[in-house]
Every structure is written in structure tokens, then in C-alpha cells.
């Protein structure tokens, strides 16, 4: 084991470094024809026509691991599959942060689950706000590095592209943060929306930087939000530790089977086509919104959404709702007291957004 891996494993809570975890019946490498080791029913439920649900699922389904590894350009040993990225975030915080001692650094306004998991674990929440400029709401990475060092951050979450801001972080900047915090913190890049950013993934940096981890999901571009297939990609040694901290059966069989089908070439080709459509619609909607009265600013976005500031965000929200369009009210988030986040829908759905907002201004 090399020094870089040793440094990362040293970030794991001391009481969990030798933790064996729960050994489920399915994790045993036994072979046989009659399976009587897990107290499962010998008969399928009448509602289960295929009879596949009476057995516990594989803890980390092999076909899905191999498919995700191929999709993300990594090895299966670098993957941990969980119930959405939320589970991976929670596992990281619980496995690395000692309550009352360690901290989790976030860059608000940002995805809220980082803060939720930190607070549930009793870890200090360290905030380095995004900076609003002509280039958008962007992470101040110098401040991230300095604050992480000064305040004992064990985990640093970089949301790239950022939700809800839409700004991205260049890979050389991600690498700079990882180098600066080597031996002190694990830098976690949340790439839930990276398919829309049209850049290489931070997974390309993992070989050189053991204190880097990447979150990916099938919920967004791959349109499988209900299946809850999230993936943490990191050094195999760290993945092994986190697997011991994970619940024994995190991936239901129907979800795994659906995800494997979604990773077949034909499905991936259709997904790529839809990503192209979303990017084109994002830019069309951005330009059209920017020309509407009452719209103060539409931020450039590398995700499948737009952050929009309004002169009267409540009126805009109510107008859209009256037209049957539900968007995300961001006004409770730091720095976003006048903002809504609008997901990029189909061309017809985006036209409804524009029609509703245009009609409101015409009637005013």
C-alpha cells in the first residue's frame, strides 16, 4: 500500500478503520442449488410473477458494477453503488467524520444533503459561499483551501456543475484543491449533472489523487430517478471500507435490472441524443428568458436547469404555477432571495414556461 492510500485511509474514523461490518448471507462466497442460509421464503409471492423477489439481492450486483465501470471509465473495484448519491454522501460523512471534532465544507447555495448529513452526524458544517460575479455564482477555491486548512475540514464537497447555480469547476482547479488538501481531507466532486457540461469527468484524476472521490448518478441524464442508482467512485481501498459501513442490501433487484438495461448501447445512444437536446433547449430558454421584462438575470448553466433572478420572484412563481408549471423556489437559499430554478423540460414544456411568463408581463 502506498503512502497516498495510507493518508486517505487515515481519514477514516479511528473506530471504523478495523470495522468488519455486517456479513450478510448473500456476501458469503458459497455455491449450491438449495439455498437455505438467509431465512427467505421457499415460495414466490403471488404478486411476483417472475419469482425473482423472494431472494435477497446481491449487495453490489456484478452486472451493474461492470456496466457502470465501463460507463465511467474506471474499474469495478473503484465503485460503490448505493440508493442514489444521497446514500454515498451519508456514508462518507459517517465513515470519516468524528462527531464534534471533524468538519464538512460546502459552498452554498448548493445541494442541501451535504449539510443534512453533516448535521445528523454531529460534524461541523463549514460554509464557503459562492461568489457572485459577471461569470456567475462560482466557488472561491482559494477560500475553500484556506478555510478547509484552518477549520479542520475532513470532507470537502465540490458540486460541479453546481446545483442550483449551474457553474462548473475546471479539472485543473479540482486537482489544485486535491493537492492542497492531501493528507487532511477527502475532496468529493459531485458530478450529478456532468453529462450536460460536455467535459471529461473528474474520474480521470483519481489515479493521481487518492484523496479525491467522485459522485455519479443515473437519476438525471439517464432518466432513472425512481431507480435510485448512485455511484461513488474512489480508491478501491476506501471503497472497501465504505462497503463495510453500508447496509447489506442497498440495490433492489428490479432497480439493478432496469439500470443494466439502461446501460446497453441502444439506450446509451438515446440518452446521448437527449442530452444534446437538453443542452440546445437550455441555451434557447436562457436567451428567451433573458429578453423578458421582470427577468433580472439568467445565469449560464452547465446543468439541465437555469437559475433565474426576477424583480418579483413570488409573482413569477405564482404565474407559472397557475399555468400548471412547477419550478423550484430558491428564495430561502443564501444569496438567492429573488431566484427560481427552472429545470429544462421538453421543447413543449419550455414553451409553456415562456408563454406563461410572457402573458403575465403583457397583462401587467
Swiss-Prot record:
Enzyme class, UniProt record, top EC level: transferase
Coiled coil: none
Pathway the protein acts in: Amino-acid biosynthesis; L-histidine biosynthesis; L-histidine from 5-phospho-alpha-D-ribose 1-diphosphate: step 7/9
Family matches, as SUPFAM superfamilies: PLP-dependent transferases (SSF53383)
Pfam families: Aminotran_1_2
Record carries keyword Amino-acid biosynthesis: yes
Cofactor or coenzyme needed: pyridoxal 5'-phosphate
UniProt keyword terms in alphabetical order: Amino-acid biosynthesis, Aminotransferase, Histidine biosynthesis, Pyridoxal phosphate, Transferase
Reactions accelerated catalytically: L-histidinol phosphate + 2-oxoglutarate = 3-(imidazol-4-yl)-2-oxopropyl phosphate + L-glutamate
Protein's UniProt keywords contain Transcription regulation: no
Molecular-function GO terms, alphabetical: histidinol-phosphate transaminase activity; pyridoxal phosphate binding
Modified residues (N6-(pyridoxal phosphate)lysine): 220
GO process terms (BP): L-histidine biosynthetic process
EC number: 2.6.1.9
Subunit structure: Homodimer.
NCBIfam families associated with the record: hisC (TIGR01141)
Family according to the record: Belongs to the class-II pyridoxal-phosphate-dependent aminotransferase family. Histidinol-phosphate aminotransferase subfamily.
Protein name: Histidinol-phosphate aminotransferase
Biological source species: Stenotrophomonas maltophilia (strain K279a)
